[in-house]
Amino acid sequence: MNPIDPQVAPWEHPGAAPETPCTNCYCKKCCFHCPVCFTKKALGISYGRKRRGRKSAVHSTNNQDPVRQQSLPKRSRIQNSQEESQEEVEAETTSGGRPRQQDSSVSSGRTSGTSSSGYTRPFKTSSGSSGSACKH
């Protein structure tokens, strides 16, 4: 075993640096590439600049809009309900005395042959990951 030269910095000793340079890839091989990659990528420890979060308003204790404490006056509620009932009567008279019925498939919002969630997975291309310099 070669003796360690005290004049040389520890990171400049032979074999201290990895043979390949560090990359931005986060695959398993690259996460265990060297101690620096392990702490940054695998453990997620970074001693760089901290990200700034959203600042809350200083003058406001809560960030919500104030809720109206007063309900609608009774007179306006009565007028609204009368207007709605008049509209219903007018709709019945224009349709020949009977209220119109809607198709059951339209009213339920269902369509045949489609999935209920509508979610599709993004398609991965055969070019690999996001264009990093990692070649395994």
Curated annotation (Swiss-Prot):
Biased composition (Polar residues): 58-73, 123-136
Biological processes annotated in GO: positive regulation of viral transcription
Pfam families linked: Tat
GO molecular function term, any single one: RNA binding
Bias-annotated ranges (Basic residues): 48-57
InterPro entries, per database record: IV_Tat (IPR001831), Tat_dom_sf (IPR036963)
Chain ranges for the short sequence motif Nuclear localization signal, and RNA-binding (TAR) as given in the UniProt record: 49-55
Keywords: Activator, Host nucleus, Host-virus interaction, RNA-binding, Transcription, Transcription regulation
Chief site of localization: host cell
Ranges for region Disordered: 48-136
Keyword Transcription part of the UniProt annotation: yes
GO CC terms, sorted: host cell nucleolus
Region Cysteine-rich, annotated ranges: 22-37
Disulfide bonds: none
Top-rank lineage group of the source organism: Viruses
Location of the region described as Core in the Swiss-Prot/TrEMBL record: 38-48
Compartmental location: Host nucleus, Host nucleolus
Extent of Low complexity compositional bias: 104-120
UniProt entry tagged with the keyword Hydrolase: no
Subunit composition and interactions: Interacts with host CCNT1. Associates with the P-TEFb complex composed at least of Tat, P-TEFb (CDK9 and CCNT1), TAR RNA, RNA Pol II. Interacts with CCNT2; the resulting complex is unable to bind to TAR RNA.
Family: Belongs to the lentiviruses Tat family.
Described purpose of this protein according to its UniProt entry: Transcriptional activator that increases RNA Pol II processivity, thereby increasing the level of full-length viral transcripts. Recognizes a hairpin structure at the 5'-LTR of the nascent viral mRNAs referred to as the transactivation responsive RNA element (TAR) and recruits the cyclin T1-CDK9 complex (P-TEFb complex) that will in turn hyperphosphorylate the RNA polymerase II to allow efficient elongation. The CDK9 component of P-TEFb and other Tat-activated kinases hyperphosphorylate the C-terminus of RNA Pol II that becomes stabilized and much more processive.
Name assigned to this protein: Protein Tat
Organism of origin: Simian immunodeficiency virus (isolate TAN1) (SIV-cpz)
